[in-house]
Amino acid sequence: MKKTKFSFIYMGLLAVFILVGVGFIFFYDKDGQTAEIDQELINKTPGLATMLSVQDLLQTQLLDEHLVNIEVQQENKKDHVTVELGGNDHATIESLLKDTYNIYTSANTLTDLSALTIIWSGTLKQQNVTLMKVSFTLEQMQQLPSKTFYDIPSLASLYEKNNELNK
């Protein structure tokens, strides 16, 4: 009889422990705490908010596999963002200019930017090379919606393309 009483108490305590553990797992507010930590991290790290905004913008404009690297440099309390993107094997000057135009016209609303540089990397003749490099200041980006993607080479503060592209 003593053995049964001990087993009953032991099983009861075990059941209470399991219920408390499961309840804690299901009802613990992980998302709220994570959001608070993320916001603290964003406030403490200069350029992180801009980098996350640019990353979100790129995810809406391009497929995820295009994004290779994002770097943020502070210039006079504004952020100069350099984005390296991977072009596909069939990239043309026109397709890269169209994608670049779409990114820049969306990025002109990011007020913390001082400049945005986009570097397209890819493979030409079985070698990894820079296909195109384009840089715009925020003021130049704000002029783009009234222009076309063909105007990018003449409007950009920096425009370089690989001479082997489209040969």
Descriptions of predicted regions:
Residues 43-47, 51, 89, 134, ...:
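Intrinsic-disorder-associated interaction segments
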Residues 9-25:
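Hydrophobic membrane-insertion alpha-helices, especially the h-region
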Residues 91-114:
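Short, non-transmembrane amphipathic alpha-helical segments
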Residues 25-80:
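N-terminal, intrinsically disordered, polar/charged segments of Gram-positive cell-envelope systems
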Residues 1-9:
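Short, low-complexity patches enriched in S/T/P/G
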Residues 41-44, 84-95:
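Second-shell loop/turn segments in exported
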Residues 57-82, 113-167:
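Polar/charged, Gly/Pro-rich intrinsically disordered segments
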Residues 1-2, 88-89, 110-111, 119-125:
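Short, flexible beta-strand-to-coil junctions
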